[in-house]
Structure formats: structure tokens, C-alpha cells
């Protein structure tokens, strides 16, 4: 009994040496297991993304996956077996759908149309994916559009009648270029056919063949039957639309022009009485020039007329616009004022020249032969511009002798500059 207890009883505790040896054995076993797991074959299958361009529709057939098939030597793993089956199935599906990459994007042939009609009768008008699988080279969208726009049995392919064009015009006035909505209102006409008819009518108006067709139509009006004539309801409607657009553009341009005219008014609007700016500004000045001309034409001013001699102490110049005297004697001013009051004014003779032009030429160039007798004194009787000052104070106003009895005239600028420099007193005649 004791031996059995020793055999079946609890093991005695291990010593330090036994624990060390036991750890070494465990490490060896772990390393062997790792080596055996490395030697096992690993099968990897990669399935790439399959993308199929189906008439502007991209369909992705599943993500990329990596599946590891682990076979433990001769023993087959059931999980690995399932993964292998799914990988094989995916590979078969990918090979099937890879063949549908090469789609035909050209026109449909008569054979394809007949096959599509037969498939639609078998599967109906909704299962386009199934129909496209049996129709090689065509996508589901291509089959659907071909059927609804061309192969449907209720589609009208003859010319448009006046009633159809009237419905088209009325619907276009209400909803605009919504061809799908208009197609619901016109039985037998698809969205594509309505749009094509609209564009063809518009292009026919703008083409150069229009005049030839009109001339031929005028010649053949008597022979042509009413059914052969093309309805012109849509054509007239398109013309009215274009005419309205042109009128709108013209109105906008007119509004822009009126705004620009209002922002920049003319002088004729300012002077509404018919007087121009030159006549308004030139009226008073012409009268003043006539006044000066009459004075100097009838009463030329000189030192002798003023009762002054050249031997006086301070004598200043006389010009055609007034007197400048630097003399403290008040009697001199009185004599000048009296002489100015006693001067008589006579109206000048009517001449084709302006008084301002004659007066300026008289100031700058002296008197001419044609006007010396009527308006201004002759060169022999014209006065001289003299300035007598003590010690020659003002060189600008020095007298200039002339051997030919012509005396230099002084213009307004020289007269004013002399009056400012000499601090002279100016007595205007006006």
C-alpha cells in the first residue's frame, strides 16, 4: 500500500539541479516545434481587383484578398480546404468576367438588333444585365438605350405632323428644354427623336441651303401635295425666339447708350435759348473793345494833348488802355479826368473784320494801311511811349527813337509790368 501511495502519490519537490535540467528540455522541444512549423508549405492566392468599363459604368468585382492555405504535412486542414474552394470559385468568376472587358462602342448591326429583340421578348424590358451577358460586346446600358430609342415597337419613324409640332411648341413654352418631360406628352416620340427634330429645324434655318430650298418650294408649290409639305409651326416658333433674343440685345444696348448720354450732357442742352458759349462770353468784351477803339481812333493820346512837355520832372507813358503817371501834382490828375470826360465817342464803320482782331493787331503790330483812316490814326500821328525818370531808373521803359517816323507800340504786358516796377498809378479809361 505504501508503494502504491508512493507511485500514485504526489511527486517530491524538485531540486535546483533538476529544475535547470527540466528547463533545458523544454527549450529544446519549443525550438523543434518552430522548425517543424517553418517547414510546412504555405499556398498563397492573390486575386486582383477586376474593373469592367461598361459604357461609362465601372463595376468592381470584389476587393483584393490574400488567402493562405496551410497544409499540415499529409494531414489536411479542414479550414484550409474551405479557403481553397472559395479561392478557386473566385478565380473562375474572375476569368468569366475578364472576357467582358472588350466592349463594342460603335454602331449596332442588324444581327445585334435582331438578337436584342429576341432577348427582350424572352427576359422582358427590365433584366438588362442578364441580356447583356448573352449579348457579347454590349453592356446593359447600351442594350437599354438601343431598345428604348430605336427598337421599341411603338416608336414613330415617319415625319412630324402639325399636331405633334403644336404640342411640342406648347410644352416648350411651359417647361423649356426638358425633352424627357415633353416625350411623355407626345406618344410615339422619344426624348432623342424630339431633341434631334428641334436641332435639325434650327440648323435648317441657319444653313445656306435655306434660300435654295425656298426657291425650289415656290416653284413646286402647285405640283406638291399638302401631305408632302413640311409643317412650319416649329420653324416659326424658333424664329420668334431668335427675334425676341435680338430685340432684347438691342434694348440693352440702347439703355447703355442712353445712360452714357445722360451722364455727359452737351452744351446745346445747357444753352437752351440757342446762344452758344462763345457768344455769351464774347458779348461784353466786344463792346469794351469797341469802346477802346473809338477813343483811340478819334482822340489819340499824346503828351501834347495832355498839356505836358518832355521837360517835366516825372512823366510816364501813355498807352491805348489808360494813363500811368508818377507825379505828385494833383492838378495833373484833374486835367486827365477832364480830358477823359470831354472825349466823344463815335460808332465805328461796319467792317467785315472783328473789332477784337483789329484792336490786337493795332497793339502788337501797329496800324496798317487799310485801317489807318477809318479806325486808328496813321503812323505819323501815333503817339510815342516815353518815360523820363531821374538817373534812368527804369530801363524797360526807356524811349526808343525811330528814324523812319514809325514809333514802337507797347502791348498790355509791357504796360502792366512797367506799372508794377515803377509803382505807377493806373487810370483806366473805362
From Swiss-Prot:
Keyword match Repeat = yes
PROSITE patterns the record matches:
HTH_MYB (PS51294)
Q: What happens when the gene is disrupted?
A: No visible phenotype under normal growth conditions, but in the double mutant plants myb64 and myb119 the female gametophytes fail to cellularize, resulting in enlarged coenocytes with supernumerary nuclei.
Pinpoint the HTH myb-type domain residues.
Answer: 100-155, 156-206
Stretches of Basic residues bias are at 200-213
Instruction: Give the residue ranges for region: Disordered.
Output: 53-79, 193-229, 374-405
Keyword set, alphabetical order: DNA-binding, Nucleus, Repeat, Transcription, Transcription regulation
- Identify one Gene Ontology CC term for this UniProt entry: nucleus
Indicate what this protein is called per its UniProt record. Transcription factor MYB119
**What is the protein's species of origin?**
Arabidopsis thaliana
